[in-house]
Amino acid sequence: SADYDGILLSTTGDKSDAIITRDLSKTLTVMPGDCLVIALIDEKAGIKGILHAGWKGLIDGVIVNTINMFKEKGANVNNIRGLLFPSVSMNCYDLGEDVISRFRDFAKELGLNEKEVISYNKEKEKYNIDLRKLALTQIKKLGIKDENMSVMEYCTYSSKDEKGNLKFHSHRRDRTLSMNMALFLGKE
């Protein structure tokens, strides 16, 4: 981890996928493609953070590292609340055989039956992964209560508004980095 003027960066390898601060007045920002973004806060301890959990970061421990940093800074898992922002849903998240074994191992580590979080799409010849369920299971195993977590169920790839227009930019669908979402975690 690294500390920059009260903003802590949670690192996984050589990348930083989470920002934590003890200054609740600071606004934190992340720009995901289709990956999970999770906002966490312990108001009693005065700590908040936002993390980006793509498939690599999720497996490599970004959630564990971030919650451990919260605890190191005085947070209590019983007081941590969180929100999962819109992300690509299981049915739209295609992965190849090259990474699926890592997910099988990860699901097993979390005590999940792989059929709960991994499916095979014969038509596309790809695997589908439920990143949300994997993340929520890991968060629960780290001691954060289910009732303290909220999930925005929208799929960044396929969710449409009432007029039938796509709601979100999707890196996977649009194959471009432009028009990316920006998510902000600020003060009320």
Where are these regions (language model features)?
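Active-site microenvironment for binding and transforming phosphate-containing groups
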Residues: 1-188
